[in-house]
């Protein structure tokens, strides 16, 4: 009886570990590429940043295909897609994420920035309203971007 319990727990642990680490690995690798891309942007190394965003996007697409509708994955898919110049598709990823979690801080900030970049300030203000109660730097950043006091770094 005890050995059957031990075997079933070992099998269960093995199956859950492999599926979750796969998602984390692709997602984590993508996040690393995004962080490096942001550093390249700060140094005006635009082409190097673009290549990193492309790598990140590819990993995020793979992760989203295998494990769809993870809000953080959709947030970064929206971000990388926007950074690669496809605002329309980036917006779709953000909106898909908001259907799952309408108060997601990252999505609301980045989508607000996208709306400012595409001259839809009224929609950016709506994102700001969602962030109003978060007591977070994302609220302050988006507020400053909407007011024209700050330019979006990303």
Question: Can you say where each PLM-predicted feature lies in the sequence?
Answer:
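Terminal, low-structured helical/coil segments at or just beyond the last alpha-helical repeat
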Residues: 15-24, 125-154
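Structural marker of alpha-solenoid helical repeat scaffolds
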Residues: 66, 100, 131-134
């Amino acid at each position: 009886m005890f050995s059957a319990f031990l075997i079933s727990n070992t099998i269960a642990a093995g199956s859950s570990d492999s599926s979750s680490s796969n998602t984390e690995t692709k997602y984590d690798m993508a996040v690393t590429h995004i962080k490096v891309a942001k550093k390249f942007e700060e140094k005006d190394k635009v082409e190097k940043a673009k290549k990193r965003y492309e790598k990140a996007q590819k990993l995020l697409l793979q992760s989203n295909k295998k494990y769809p509708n993870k809000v953080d994955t959709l947030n970064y898919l929206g971000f990388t897609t926007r950074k690669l110049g496809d605002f329309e598709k980036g917006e779709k990823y953000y909106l898909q994420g908001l259907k799952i979690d309408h108060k997601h801080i990252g999505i609301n900030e980045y989508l607000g920035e996208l709306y400012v970049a595409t001259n839809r300030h009224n929609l950016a203000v709506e994102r700001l309203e969602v962030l109003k109660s978060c007591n977070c730097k994302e609220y302050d950043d988006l507020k400053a971007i909407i007011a024209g006091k700050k330019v979006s770094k990303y």
